[in-house]
């Protein structure tokens, strides 16, 4: 993506009206400008560039072309690759600028981000400095409870990780191929065909992996070298076939170049963030880039080089590496710095600022390190510079981890809130189960109200702010909750598993988060509890698209059918439905819309028809942002993180759901009073942290509310 351009020497052939291009390729410098414009404007949210992320693919093909050509030329002339010189050149070119931006980004994160979020950024910085950031981001992408975290200012370093891993394996591949060829072919290893065959095999395997993983594990497909190597191999194949490209007549070469540029621009416009990627969709920008590079092997004024070689394009191309490094952290860190969300004008201003920083970095850091004569003469000095840059970045992030402490409450210890099961009060005209619900809710309301005005985060907060992100109920990690691509349901019964009374808790992650409360109730009442949950998959018959998978969520539809068949066979005494209310148009429906309300009524009616009592749990309050992160920045004023009730809860949506559940013959539990007072919704009750992230309750708060949950379940079962 960002290596020095070194062409492949070949004896030029003089043909009328065309000239084979040798040596430095100014058109590739201009092509870099196209790539960086696409990425930067896409991240800035400029309309019409929804697929601008393909700019990274353009960079990969360019890198594959330049590096493969350099290695092949050396191995065919010297029978080997001087690895010290090769890695020294890469270190000079890439690492000083990357380290400069990384250290500046980490320091800025320490200043403007909440401590809890900043510490995650420092860990991202360490992984990026060690060139494994792409795999850290891939792992975070497969963790459902981490997938809602705000993007990292280091996330764009994933492509540098891919490049560095490419540099680690590609020379060995070329050297190994040369060694084999030299022993099987008389006259040495000078012909390109064997190398092209090896690259073709590697590329085909990588493309197959990309197509498979894009559906099976999108984050790993996007971030990993095995699924991106084919893009680099495509550039390498162009380098190995350069003599054939140079023999093209002028007109076909120009058509290839313009067609390739059109493919790149078309994908920038037509692809969408939800397009499964890279998969086979990446073939378009990769093919387009290969055509531009291949067609550009012939000059004559007809190809896209007449645009790409213009001074302004070349100037942007020269600064593209530093601009790529700066643009993302500036875009992400500007809103918290200014204390307000950034609209399009502000984002465009941020891209200008990042461009200015890029120019400074190129002149002050990048070029001096790249072209310094002592470094160019000494591979050891170049490698030492690269090692220093890597160590400096990692050490800076480690140091910041010690400077920015693990956030903790330092207010007075708060008494633990308590909600207990009381003997039902004798209330005229009120049955005992209804009385128990009222008593439990009254205790919860009192606990919430008592905590509403507490400002300082208590020193005995449970779980602590540092522990909150890992406060996952067992169901989230033991395989009992189905992930995106999983169907069926593991046998994860709890409570008294031999009991004739079965309670089924069903839904998405918002059903799973209530599992600790229901488990406590099931153990007390000797019920058999079956929690049947699948991420972002409510048990409502609605066509659903997964923004994560970027396609129709067929696994959800299959799982729903399997669960309904299981319920019809088991006839549980009570079915509890719980689901997030954060579904929006990207899922092909939205929470509380008419289709949602109708589907809820039908689901309740269908479950009642199999003989089960049905309880629908209403929504929890929506804090809209990560509560632990917010509190880490407001340890002296927890009320700053408490959302207003009117924003956190849709009273109209709750009323519509309540009517739908009643129409289907079920019970509905409005949970608003368990989280909110009339004007706002506290995020700490007693000494218990309510939310572990931006929408899931902590295990501790779910268990605190177990008496309320038990009373609601008793009432639903008694009412049939």
Feature-to-residue mapping (PLM):
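Extracellular/periplasmic envelope-modification machinery, especially enzymes
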Residues: 3-7, 273, 338-348, 352-356, ...
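Membrane-interface helix/loop caps of multi-pass membrane proteins
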Residues: 2-401, 719
């Amino acid at each position: 993506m960002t290596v020095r351009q070194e062409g492949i020497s070949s004896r030029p052939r003089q043909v009328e009206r065309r000239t084979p291009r040798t040596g430095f390729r100014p058109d590739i410098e201009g092509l870099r400008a196209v790539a960086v414009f696409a990425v930067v404007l896409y991240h800035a949210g400029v309309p019409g560039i929804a697929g601008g992320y393909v700019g990274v693919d353009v960079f990969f093909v360019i890198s594959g072309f330049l590096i493969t050509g350099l290695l092949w030329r050396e191995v065919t002339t010297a029978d080997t690759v001087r690895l010290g010189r090769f890695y020294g050149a890469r270190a000079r070119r890439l690492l000083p600028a990357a380290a400069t931006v990384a250290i500046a980004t980490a320091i800025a994160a320490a200043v403007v981000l909440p401590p809890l979020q900043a510490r995650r950024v420092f860990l991202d910085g360490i992984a990026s400095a060690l060139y494994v950031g792409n795999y850290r981001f891939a792992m975070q992408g497969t963790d459902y409870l981490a997938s809602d975290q705000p993007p990292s200012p280091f996330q764009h370093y994933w492509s540098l990780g891919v490049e560095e891993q490419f540099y680690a394996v590609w020379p060995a591949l070329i050297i190994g191929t040369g060694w084999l060829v030299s022993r099987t072919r008389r006259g040495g290893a000078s012909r390109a065909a064997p190398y092209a065959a090896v690259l073709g095999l590697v590329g085909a395997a990588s493309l197959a992996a990309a197509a498979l993983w894009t559906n099976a594990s999108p984050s790993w497909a996007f971030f990993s070298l095995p699924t991106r190597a084919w893009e680099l191999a495509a550039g390498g194949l162009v380098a190995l076939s350069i003599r054939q490209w140079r023999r093209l007549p002028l007109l076909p070469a120009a058509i290839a170049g313009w067609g390739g540029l059109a493919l790149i621009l078309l994908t920038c416009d037509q692809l969408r963030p939800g397009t499964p990627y890279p998969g086979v969709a990446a073939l378009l920008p990769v093919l387009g880039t290969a055509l531009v590079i291949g067609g550009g092997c012939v000059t004559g004024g007809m190809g896209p080089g007449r645009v790409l070689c213009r001074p302004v394009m070349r100037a942007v191309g020269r600064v593209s590496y530093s601009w790529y490094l700066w643009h993302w952290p500036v875009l992400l860190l500007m809103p918290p710095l200014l204390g307000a969300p950034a609209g399009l004008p502000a984002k465009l201003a941020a891209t200008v600022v990042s461009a200015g920083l890029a120019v400074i970095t190129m002149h002050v850091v990048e070029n001096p390190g790249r072209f310094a004569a002592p470094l160019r003469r000494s591979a050891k000095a170049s490698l030492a510079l690269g090692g220093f840059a890597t160590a400096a970045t990692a050490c800076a992030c480690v140091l910041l981890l010690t400077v920015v402490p693990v956030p903790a409450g330092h207010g007075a210890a708060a008494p633990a809130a308590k909600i207990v099961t009381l003997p039902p009060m004798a209330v005229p005209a009120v049955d005992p189960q209804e009385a128990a619900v009222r008593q439990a809710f009254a205790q919860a309301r009192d606990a919430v109200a008592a905590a509403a005005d507490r400002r300082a985060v208590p020193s005995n907060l449970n779980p602590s702010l540092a522990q909150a992100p890992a406060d996952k109920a067992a169901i989230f990690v033991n395989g009992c909750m189905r992930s995106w691509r999983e169907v069926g349901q593991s046998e994860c019964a709890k409570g008294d598993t031999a009991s004739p009374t079965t309670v089924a808790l069903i839904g998405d992650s918002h059903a799973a988060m209530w599992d600790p409360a229901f488990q406590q109730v099931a153990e007390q009442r000797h019920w058999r509890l079956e929690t049947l949950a699948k991420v972002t998959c409510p048990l409502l018959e609605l066509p659903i698209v997964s923004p994560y998978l970027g396609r129709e969520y067929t696994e959800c539809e299959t799982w729903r059918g399997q669960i309904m068949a299981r319920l019809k066979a088991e006839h549980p005494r009570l079915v509890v439905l719980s689901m997030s209310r954060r579904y929006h148009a990207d899922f092909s429906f939205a929470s509380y819309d008419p289709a949602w309300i109708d589907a809820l009524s039908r689901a309740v009616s269908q479950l009642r028809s199999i003989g089960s009592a049905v309880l629908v749990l209403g929504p929890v309050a929506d804090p809209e942002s990560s509560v632990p992160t917010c509190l880490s920045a407001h340890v002296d004023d927890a009320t700053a993180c408490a959302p207003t009730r009117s924003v956190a809860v849709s009273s109209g949506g709750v009323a519509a759901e309540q009517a739908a559940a009643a129409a289907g013959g079920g019970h509905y539990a409005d949970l608003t009073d368990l989280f909110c007072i009339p004007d706002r919704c506290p995020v700490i009750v007693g000494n218990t942290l309510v939310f572990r992230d931006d929408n899931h309750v902590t295990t501790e708060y779910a268990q605190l509310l177990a008496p309320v949950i038990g009373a609601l379940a008793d009432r639903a079962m008694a009412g049939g």
